[in-house]
Amino acid sequence: MNFKEYVPLAMRTCKSLPTADHINHMCLGIVGEMGELVDQIKKAYVYGKAIDQVNIIEEVGDVAYYTAGLVQHFPALADWLDSDELKQSINYEKLEVARENITRTILLNAMSAANLAADLMMFADDDNLQDANAEQVAKALGTALFATAVLLEVDLSQACE
């Protein structure tokens, strides 16, 4: 399943809110779920627990759900997440190096996602939604989330089931 196919399925369960509230809800959801993802990594790093791959897939799926909610207002985001251009924009060599310090990298990606979500919330009112910068921020957020999924070896299509 690609992201475009996933969005309408995911949004069947999404509460209907005015545009600005909906975008804020999705951005806050992304930040919260990235926090839960970081918590899983923390448990492995600090307490030596094995990474629970099933839970990791669930958390990435939750992040994908909230990202799907942004697609309603930034349709280009779905195209971006399904594009070869996104996959080519990821520096896989850097990700391999980053994998050596996965805790730090996941934390940096989570912080990046949180900052981008906060930036996106500034565009939440209808007057600013058409701003080209809003679409760029949405794409950057999608890239941070995709890179995190790649780093954790989670196939987004698997997480979107």
Predicted features along the sequence, with ranges:
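Flexible "arm" and connector segments at domain edges
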Residues: M1-E161
